[in-house]
Amino acid sequence: MRTAFYISDGTAITSEVFGHATLSLFPVEFNHKTIPFVETEEKAHQIKELINATAKRDGEKPLIFFTFVNYNLTEIISSANAVCYDFLTTYSEKIEKELNVAPVPKIHRTHSIHEKSYDFRIDAVNYALMNDDGGNIKNYGEADIILIGVSRSGKTPTSLYLALQYGIKAANYPITEDDLETEGLPKCLIPFKHKLFGLTIDPERLAAIRDRRMANSKYASIRQCRIEVREVEMLYKRNRIPFLNSTHHSVEEISAKIISDTDLERRKY
């Protein structure tokens, strides 16, 4: 199996994101290896030796996705027996030409702490934890969004991801079997209808998830899951609540779709 390296003098997050996004376009499996904080020439030479050894072992050149602000480190890694992709140089040169402004290299700039956005995210994470699964309904006035759905439909991980990644205060509320016996929304949610966003899920997937939690129970039965999913989707439609199916989407995709559909403000930068 061919190896793909993601290397940087910072966190290597940018290299990973660009690299994985690019490789995902090809139906080929890779052995992925991430190496962050390559900040000295000595360390760069060590990594070069590792890359060369990997090429010899695999019988083919590794793919190297890297981001360095230090040109000397770029030169060292680029001289390895590998196919190299330098994202920063590729794009910064074009942008420099367009803006007529020279870039100012700074290590860790991309994923360093920006005080304002950091505070937003910490506050949002604390809010999501305190308002998980219907807790602290009295705080819903502070919410940017309130996710609703049947149990185990993806509300909690999505709430936390929205908070941690984007600084969005996301509460979540479970729609129970009792709630579904009426045609209306739970009374506590009515004042915040404009903040509601629903999640649904395929019954078969829901049953599998619930079975890991409470095996052989009514709660995890496919019949119960089908009833709950059908009823909650009818609830969404009756009350004109936007919703999406989380079955085949990652938490990143779900969150991005929610932000796109609701025009929520990202507080990432």
Curated annotation (Swiss-Prot):
List where the protein spans the membrane. none
Per its record, what are the GO molecular function terms? ADP binding; ATP binding; phosphotransferase activity, phosphate group as acceptor; protein serine/threonine kinase activity
Q: Which reaction does it catalyse?
A: [pyruvate, water dikinase] + ADP = [pyruvate, water dikinase]-phosphate + AMP + H(+); [pyruvate, water dikinase]-phosphate + phosphate + H(+) = [pyruvate, water dikinase] + diphosphate
Name the UniProt key words of this record, in alphabetical order. Answer: Kinase, Nucleotide-binding, Serine/threonine-protein kinase, Transferase
The record ties this protein, via InterPro entries, to:
Kinase-pyrophosphorylase, PSRP
Provide the residue positions that the database annotates as binding ADP.
G149, V150, S151, R152, S153, G154, K155, T156
**This protein's record includes keyword Secreted:** no
**In its keyword annotation, does this UniProt entry include Nucleotide-binding?**
yes
Enzymatic class: transferase
List the EC numbers from the record: 2.7.11.33, 2.7.4.28
Indicate the family of this protein: Belongs to the pyruvate, phosphate/water dikinase regulatory protein family. PSRP subfamily.
Q: Which PANTHER family match?
A: PYRUVATE, PHOSPHATE DIKINASE REGULATORY PROTEIN 1, CHLOROPLASTIC
Relate the protein's function as given in its record: Bifunctional serine/threonine kinase and phosphorylase involved in the regulation of the phosphoenolpyruvate synthase (PEPS) by catalyzing its phosphorylation/dephosphorylation.
Record-given protein name: Putative phosphoenolpyruvate synthase regulatory protein
